Amino acid sequence: LFQSEKGKNTMKDYLVRGMSMDGFVKVVAIRSTELVRRGAEIQKTTPNATAAFGRALTAASMMGNMQKVENGSMTLQIRGGGPIGTITVVSDAEGNVRGYVTEPRVPLVEKYPGKLDVGATVGTNGTITVIRDLQMKEPYIGSTELVSGEIGDDVTAYFAQSEQIPTACALGVLVDRDTSVKVAGGYILQLLPGAPEETVSALEAGIQRAGAVTPMLEAGMTPEDILGQVCGS
């Protein structure tokens, strides 16, 4: 379903970007394990902060890469009122990112044993803000209220509400028992204007069928594999 523009099949971090064969869906996927590991080491994050910060790093890398403005940059800021405080990540047009959190040493909160509660760490009483420097006089600034604090849902809602682009964003960071990052990655799919209903339906079914990103990454799937699974090719 998609034609990747770049990417190589190694276990190193990399990103693929492409378009569906019918030209109605823009796709990007990333393996960001080493990026998240490095970010966690620098920030000295506890597991919940690692998961939240890692998701933000992953999302920002894809969002920055999607801009296609050579010297542009994109800043993703998430402020939800939770114990982590504010998450700020800046990406260049290649998807290289840097970022920080105001409180890296947050307490352990689980939805159930073995499942970190990122939403509780980030909070839901706040906003997701995107600042795009597109090498013009003024940067573009968009902001929407947080939906869940899980970050993927919030990025999805941001694009739909602030930029009017129907989007699906899925992010995953698996923190191992020794608090190291086992795998990290994600994908963003965006519908372009004029997409027929059958494209929308097929995409929705593919997202449901594929399920969460983390198990796919843990199974060793590449970004291309994940897009194939979600897009049904």
Predicted regions: what they are:
Residues S4-G232:
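Interaction interfaces in information-processing and related assembly proteins
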Residues L1:
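Contiguous, function-dense segments enriched for cysteine-driven chemistry
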